[in-house]
Amino acid sequence: VIGSGPSGLAAADQLNQRGHSVTVFEREDRVGGLLMYGIPNMKLEKQIIERKINIMKEEGIEFRTGVNVGKDITAAELLKDFDRVILCCGASNPRDIKAEGRDAKGIYFAVDFLKSTTKALLNGGLTDKNHISAKGKNVMVIGGGDTGNDCVGTSVRPVSYTHLTLPT
């Protein structure tokens, strides 16, 4: 199975339940695709996804992360090593708009913003400073669907962490 987003996980789970040996390839560093990086934690806690993935691993599904199919492994290699290949790679290319100033600094695609923020949060609580931050900025979101609302929520949501050490 190529891709570990919603369709990839569903396909892997169904095939595994029917007795097939299943390997899932994911180009990112974590399994889950859109579920892991595209939906903010305020809507879908990542520990829920991680719990499901751990159950799938215990049931025998193999996950290979950091593998970009087509670059790191060819289609010919996959077809040689596996009986069947299922493409569940989603739509990762953003839809651009033609507007004056579109190429100005500080304009980002929604998926890049959400992925960057979620990845930084998972990697260390936004301490890496490599993510796209909306802190202290005026933010305009074009689009009012789920993705637009996720961007608004991520932009205005204060992220703070308190590390508490309890005496033992």
Question: What residue ranges belong to the model's regions?
Answer:
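Glycine-rich dinucleotide-binding loop and its adjacent helix/turn
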Residues: 54-71, 94-158
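Residue-level detector of alpha-helix initiation sites
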Residues: 5-7, 30, 145-147
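N-terminal Rossmann-like dinucleotide/flavin-binding domain of flavoprotein oxidoreductases
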Residues: 34-84
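Conserved small/polar residues in nucleotide/adenosyl-binding loops
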Residues: 162-168
